[in-house]
């Protein structure tokens, strides 16, 4: 750096080597490696003449590209500064996820800084998955990743046995430039895009979810048996006679927690026993490195990609009934008001006395089911004690001000052919909440224990809403005659009081949704900043080390203290923990996106035979380009594009979350109920189009005219409006990672409940999450066929009046 600065001009490799006096081949090779690393890290760039020059942070900005399906993008600077807007011309050079150096080129008409890409430091993708299209002898792949809208050319001699329309994996031979499309060759044919399970296969590959286990992991676990060796049980607290039980969903396969409660003179004693994963996964072992690489288990509608091999996740680390298991135990004592007055952690060995489901527990506690009560008579008294403690803890949580947003979680029911037969809501009752309170209590106890001992660890932070979001929220509430207390720094209790005040209003859902969207995203960090949504001064994740790497790290920190070691002697520094926390947060988001993509594809497939049908729905998002509507009872979301609304010019109010007609004054607002007709399903883009079904703009000719215009008008509207700031699809579709909509293992909702960190596009996310579709229609065989980049989408247009399918379920 000093040499380049001193000479004040770009230097070639030979000039640099000479200036540094590096003449030996080994020295030059070392210099070459160092220069490559500095380019990768954004310290240097190499110009087109091969000269190395320093990145001047005054005008050169290294960062990562965030792509948008519509072709534009952003540069997210490494230093956390303001994003740079990248116009489509610049995005032709790069892909979503690439690390680049950009330069500020000016500002657009909205005042945003625009940038030009100077150098690509690191490519994000060496392979991609997508659908193969062959048109007039030209073969190209459309990536499944919608943030990469470019076609990838495949030379004729690289097609192999792949056929038009199949889903393939391609290896990139030439990345895109401003003047050249990317070129690739096919390395794997996944099969027909409608094959059962293909949605998940594609999501796994599109998001680079690790599936295969490295050979050294198999070598490490080869000697693990099905039973815990007697030798490793020594020195642990023996809990095998304590009637600990697991309570999970019916289809759960891995059981990582067990509970036991008993009354005491002051209140209750609660044991939360967690599978002792850290006893088997040693730091920096092959198993540990792969667990860190994955960071989390990924839950899809039809399968799970685990963080740990099955011999551990479903075997030695799963608290199966009537077998000995190693555990890490949180022992907590609560007074009559639910306040913890003593807690400790210890290593134990346990034997689960029963494997219970949520519904079984509910049927015993609420309905007194005689058969179940007799079958589980040996644990029923302790379940009643646990339920009594739950009521006290829940009341304490309400007094604290923690909020619990209403949402509907859903799951898929598949037929014998692996196709979606039904999208059904998951019932959540006191048995779920009872376990949730136990897990929250253990997580809180772990965080306070670590802080009290000044132990370095990974925490789960949820910061208060930003000033900008609060300002928008206040403007919205003012229109409704409401006010959020505690401004300019409201507490979560202020949120809870506002929800209580509004609970009987007809627009309650609207108010709740806007409050939810004002929340920040929960993340992992090495520094504790508290948890706003739970109204806690400290929080961490302790209860799920089978499926979350941060929990495993918390177990290691607690074990370090249990051995009598000093915090300063911990194997991980604060810097290392922060890097690990950021990695885990990123992989958590990746898992959410992959799960959502799979679920979206399945919902589109489910709706294919429903084109033309009419449903009642709820407006769950309003944008400059239209309305997102969630259908009642089946919880599927689609877009009513602005061109399919009444014949009027609609103004978008981002604060009021509404579109208002200029001439008619007709307003469509978040939370309104409307009737829609399913107009089109696009499997390639995983999008569903609706039109109004109540006569307004629904005439046959009007629909056809709107359909013909829809593609170009969508693009025009979004270009005019710029990035949408309020693109949230359905409530009930995973209000958080811990409450993924189609996650069949309900324990997720009973352990974390970061309901303020939605895993749906646009909720607390930048513009790139807001998606819309552009189509161009062509009449064919009595149906309209929209074609985009060679993809055909069936559309049905009908003037027939359909009755409204009103479900019996009332949703508010």
Task: Please tell me what each predicted stretch does.
Residues 1-271, 278-327, 355, 360-363, ...:
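Charge-lined substrate channels and their catalytic hotspots, especially those that engage the 3′ end
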Residues 102, 170, 622, 676-678:
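A generic structural signal for residues embedded in beta-strands
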Residues 65-67, 132, 619-621, 680-682:
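Non-cytosolic beta-sheet module surface loops
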Residues 82-87, 148-154, 635-653, 700-706:
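A short macromolecule-binding patch
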Residues 1-2, 7-14, 23-35, 42-50, ...:
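Intrinsically disordered, low-complexity mixed-charge segments
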């Amino acid at each position: 750096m000093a040499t380049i600065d001193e000479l004040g001009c770009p230097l070639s490799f030979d000039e640099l080597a000479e200036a540094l006096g590096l003449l030996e081949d080994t020295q030059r090779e070392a210099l070459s490696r160092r220069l490559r690393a500095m380019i990768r890290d954004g310290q240097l760039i190499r110009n087109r003449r091969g000269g190395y020059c320093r990145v001047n942070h005054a005008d050169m900005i290294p960062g990562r590209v965030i792509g948008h399906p519509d072709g534009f993008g952003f540069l997210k600077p490494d230093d956390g500064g303001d994003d740079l807007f990248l116009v489509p011309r610049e995005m032709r050079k790069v892909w979503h996820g690439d690390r680049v150096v950009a330069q500020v080129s000016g500002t657009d008409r909205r005042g945003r800084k625009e940038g030009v890409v100077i150098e690509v430091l690191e490519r994000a993708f060496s392979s991609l998955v997508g659908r193969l299209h062959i048109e007039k002898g030209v073969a190209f792949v459309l990536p499944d990743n919608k943030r990469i809208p470019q076609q990838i050319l495949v030379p004729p001699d690289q097609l192999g046995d792949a056929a038009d329309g199949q889903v393939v994996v391609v290896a990139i031979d030439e990345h895109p430039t401003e003047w050249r499309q990317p070129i690739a060759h096919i390395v794997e044919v996944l099969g027909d895009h409608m094959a059962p399970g293909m949605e998940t296969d594609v999501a796994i590959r599109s998001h680079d979810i690790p599936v295969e286990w490295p050979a050294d992991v198999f070598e490490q676990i080869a000697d693990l048996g099905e039973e815990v060796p007697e030798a490793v049980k020594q020195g642990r607290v023996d809990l095998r006679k304590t009637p600990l039980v697991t309570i999970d969903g019916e289809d759960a396969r891995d059981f990582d927690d067990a509970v036991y409660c008993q009354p005491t003179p002051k209140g209750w004693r609660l044991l939360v026993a967690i599978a002792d994963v850290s006893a088997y996964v040693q730091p920096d072992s092959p198993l540990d490195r792969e667990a860190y690489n994955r960071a989390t288990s990924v839950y899809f509608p039809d399968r799970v990609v685990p963080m740990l091999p099955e011999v551990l996740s479903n075997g030695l680390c799963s608290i199966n009934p009537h077998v000995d298991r190693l555990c890490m135990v949180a022992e907590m004592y609560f007074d009559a008001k639910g306040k913890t007055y003593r807690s400790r952690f210890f290593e134990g060995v346990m034997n689960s006395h029963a494997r219970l489901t949520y519904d079984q527990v509910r049927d015993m506690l609420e309905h007194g089911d005689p058969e179940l009560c007799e079958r589980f008579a040996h644990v029923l008294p302790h379940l009643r004690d646990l339920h009594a403690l739950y009521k006290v803890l829940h009341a304490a949580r309400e007094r604290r001000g923690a909020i619990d947003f209403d949402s509907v979680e859903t799951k898929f029911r598949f037929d014998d052919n692996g196709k979606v037969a039904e999208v059904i809501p998951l019932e959540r009752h006191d048995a779920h909440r009872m376990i949730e309170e136990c897990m929250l209590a253990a997580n809180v106890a772990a965080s306070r224990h670590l802080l009290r001992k000044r132990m370095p660890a990974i925490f789960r932070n949820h910061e208060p809403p930003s000033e900008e979001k609060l300002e928008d929220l206040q403007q919205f509430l003012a229109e409704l005659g409401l006010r959020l207390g505690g401004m300019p720094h409201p507490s979560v209790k202020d949120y809870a009081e506002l929800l209580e005040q509004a609970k009987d209003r007809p627009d309650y859902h609207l108010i709740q949704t806007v409050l939810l969207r004002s929340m920040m995203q929960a993340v992992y960090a090495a520094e504790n900043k508290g948890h706003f949504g739970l109204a806690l001064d400290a929080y961490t994740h302790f209860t799920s080390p089978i499926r979350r790497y941060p929990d495993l790290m918390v177990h290691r920190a607690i074990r370090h203290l249990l051995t009598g070691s000093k915090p300063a002697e911990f194997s991980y520094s604060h810097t290392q923990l922060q890097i690990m926390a950021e990695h885990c947060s990123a992989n958590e988001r990746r898992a959410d996106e992959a799960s959502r993509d799979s679920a979206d594809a399945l919902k589109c497939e489910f709706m294919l035979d429903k084109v033309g049908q009419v449903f009642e729905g709820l407006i769950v998002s309003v944008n400059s380009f239209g309305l997102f509507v969630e259908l009642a009872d089946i919880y599927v979301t689609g877009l009513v594009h602005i061109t399919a609304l009444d014949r009027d010019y609609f103004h978008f109010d981002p604060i009021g979350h509404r579109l208002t007609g200029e001439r008619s004054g007709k307003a469509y607002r978040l939370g309104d109920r409307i009737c829609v007709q399913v107009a089109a399903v696009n499997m390639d883009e995983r999008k569903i189009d609706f039109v109004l079904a109540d006569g307004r703009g629904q005439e046959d000719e009007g629909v056809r005219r709107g359909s013909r215009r829809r593609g170009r008008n969508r693009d025009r509207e979004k270009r005019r409006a710029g990035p949408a700031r309020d693109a949230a699809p359905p409530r009930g579709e995973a209000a958080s990672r811990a409450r993924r909509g189609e996650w069949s293992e309900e324990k997720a909702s009973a352990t974390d409940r970061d309901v303020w960190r939605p895993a749906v596009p646009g909720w607390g996310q930048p513009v790139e999450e807001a998606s819309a579709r552009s189509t161009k229609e062509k009449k064919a065989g009595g149906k309209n066929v929209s074609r985009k980049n060679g993809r055909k989408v069936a559309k049905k247009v009908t003037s027939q009046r359909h009755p409204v399918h009103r479900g019996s379920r009332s949703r508010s």
